[in-house]
């Protein structure tokens, strides 16, 4: 089967935004105008097509990035048909991981901002992730029909808050309830959308007299931005004072692809105005798969040679599994982005991360949660495969004759955990299946069994994250569970270097045990130490035989899992084995593993050990009247206020760093202090030393409950 759409006419885009910027409504309109969805789904009714998990519809927030395909030939059918693959991404900070993983497979992004709220906290997080993956982007300022809407303020905030370089290509006609359409600065005409056809039809009109000066001013800025793309354009602009429509588009496109500028548009998705022009901008300014840097990976050879795969059907097949979902009808759905080559139904694929060969069952393309079967997918496509058993998020799939491992995704360590217990014996088995599946779908969610209590502990990125996991266990798998109180993921580390002997000797008649080591423990930078540990050896003259180095390393690492102070994992330590002794008969791996473990345990307590706690970046938006109460409350929670911003309408944004341990139940407290008018967002910032008075309480509690961290 030949390719239906040339790869140069593909656009793989993500739509990302802060919670209430109207992202799902914007995506809905995209599906409506591109002819996929005939009844517009409104989030207010809990009926949006993209929000396809029940909880998302109830909570009105988007949790999972559903991938959808649609086609667009321009508002006035001025382009050849383009295929746009849209990945809807969540706007809540607990789901930053979802944004991260969709950024990884996108070629371009459309940032949606609220014309009233402007650039909000989550927008900054998403912007940073887009920078990290060098994703070209444009911005759409939505909700121009709302009271307090101001397009130019949002443009200014992209500059000041995000460090972006925004270039508006439209200016709004009116605002709030007088918002009527936009002036297209490239065409220098007003675009008026027809309300009777829900914006499917439009007409060009003359620019309203009161907007002529504003339009000229912003057009000049836009043309200057385009001229900076090349010397030829700049020379022509300096000579003639203007550029042609084609030159403006080419200049802006080149600079957008180089991530030097961000084209900005505006509209009201709810009122069916502006999304159509934004779709045209996606085609005009965002890259096709062939215009982004070829994906890089590592070949399957001794030297782990770096290699890349061009976006071409002729290249060997390579794809990245970026999301796994459990579907009650077909089982596991693995969403893949194909970077090169062709994959047909029934083909074998190789997973170099797991060293496993699998066969593709069905290939389906998703439109929100409806699916269409495909015979094959090609370079640039995003689709879901059915029947893959051992694939997890971030794995590579490739042709087994041309093995390549694409760059892996990095997932953050969870910062909050809680115990879950099934209510009945019947729930026990269902719960372990449910948690296994959910952990496979979401790499930032972890499940483990506490060795002492035997309890099942689930860990994630925030309270909402774990709430939703528990909710999904109940809805999708019918598991009733009792939930414990949330627990903070503390860590332990040291502040000074020590040298420590560790000895393990057992004589019981016959063959004994003998392991003897000297280990140096040194602190590493705690700021960086999410999970850091280094092992080195400086043994001279064979005092410890080489074959036991690994055992010493293993003994130390196992001991680090349950720290010495309060049983929490140890981070930020460099351990160096530098001396010891051995016995020809009695020494073995186990003896040296135990000797390493003892040296670590005893040395740790002499090295000025401290407890680390997760510190969260908290941003509260509140009417000025409640600011004093909110600031006082943050201080009581050991918060450090970092700064304040004035927002429109007398609202203040307070930025602070607060220990996670003090943030439980914050939402309820904040609502009651502000009569429900304040909102907040929270994301992990760093680990920092826990104040002594707080740490003493945690350590005392641990010690009175029996020494979890001791192995003698």
UniProtKB/Swiss-Prot annotation:
The answer to whether keyword Acyltransferase applies is no
Q: One MF term in GO for this entry?
A: GTP binding
Q: Where in the cell is it found?
A: Cytoplasm
Q: Which GO terms describe its cellular component?
A: cytoplasm
Stretches assigned to the tr-type G domain: 8-290
Keywords associated with the record:
Cytoplasm, Elongation factor, GTP-binding, Nucleotide-binding, Protein biosynthesis
For biological process, the GO terms are:
ribosome disassembly
Q: Which domain of life is it from?
A: Bacteria
Binding locations of GTP? 17-24, 88-92, 142-145
Protein name, UniProt field: Elongation factor G
Q: What is the lineage of its organism?
A: Bacteria, Pseudomonadati, Pseudomonadota, Gammaproteobacteria, Moraxellales
